[in-house]
Amino acid sequence: MKLISWNVNGLRAVVGKGFAEIFASLDADFFCLQETKMQAGQLDLEFEGYQSYWNFAEKKGYSGTAIYTKHTPLSVAYGIGVDEHDHEGRVITLEMPDFYLVTCYSLNSQDGLRRLDYRMTWEDDFRAYLLANKKKKPVIVCGD
């Protein structure tokens, strides 16, 4: 199994810089992207043999995650089930037969640590989400 994780810092920008060629050359089973900074319908980027799953932030040009996979998941979850966090498009979870694959774009505390309190709440809630899934089967986490 080959898994690639990449913070693209704006997917539309890297598409013009050879993204499709890099994607094809890596031939990964799972290709997890963070910080896509896109909204639904902004870019039609499909690859033969892959299914794609997207979690868009409500705020335009902000965060966002995606997973491309050659394997059909048993289920897909968007977010961690906490409304306070799930509007930012930060997490996608694929349930596979033997494991969960979680891609995450964790939030930044920002200049002057403006969001530090929120970041700490996020960390606690994300950890609880991972531990709850871990009770069912192994969890693979990627992202930043």
PLM segments and residue spans:
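Acidic/histidine-rich, metal-coordinating catalytic segments
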Residues: 137-144
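N-terminal, active-site-proximal structural segment of metallo-dependent hydrolase catalytic domains
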Residues: 1-47, 57, 62
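A long, amphipathic alpha-helix that forms part
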Residues: 116-136
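Glycine/threonine-rich flexible loop motifs
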Residues: 111-115
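Short, flexible loop segments at the rims of nucleotide/cofactor-binding pockets, characterized by
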Residues: 7-13, 79-82, 117-120
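Structured beta-strand-rich core segments of catalytic domains in phosphoester-bond hydrolases
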Residues: 37, 43-109
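Active-site-proximal beta-strand elements of phosphoester/diester hydrolases
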Residues: 1-9, 98-110, 142
